[in-house]
A protein has these predicted regions:
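Catalytic phosphate/metal-binding cores of nucleic-acid and nucleotide-processing enzymes, i.e., regions
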Residues: 2-121
Length: 121
């Protein structure tokens, strides 16, 4: 699995403020890990977020092209056969310490959040 790492931090894609989480609404957690760590998709989301004031927004066709190119998929109209991508429109990137344990959880309203604080006995 490829990851975007800068300054010993790993970029993780998730979808806060969304009724259908990018990670939590996909049943195949192993397959979705390729997506939430994919450097090219994360770079695209970071670029869109940086330029939102200029009217940039997530383009599903661009996302599909990224997935096709880098995950060697051949996705067309049947994107839901591979990933449930409703959460991609509100996707954000969180930088976590490399090797740190984390979990993506979801609120009752479907908003994802990243848990990094774990209790240890």
């Amino acid at each position: 699995m490829r990851k975007l790492i800068e300054n010993n931090k790993v970029a993780v894609l998730y979808s806060p403020g969304c009724g259908a989480g990018l990670y939590t609404w996909n049943d195949d957690k192993e397959k979705i890990l390729d997506l939430i760590f994919l450097p090219e998709l994360i770079t695209y989301v970071l670029d869109v977020r940086k330029n939102e004031k200029q009217g940039y927004e997530i383009d599903l066709n661009k996302v599909i092209n990224i997935l096709n190119n880098y995950l060697e998929l051949n996705i067309n109209e049947d994107i839901d056969d591979y990933y449930y991508l409703s959460g991609i429109y509100k996707a954000q990137v969180q930088w976590l310490n490399q090797g740190a344990p984390f979990h993506i959880d979801v609120t009752d309203t479907g908003s994802e959040y990243i848990v990094t604080d774990f209790l240890y006995a």
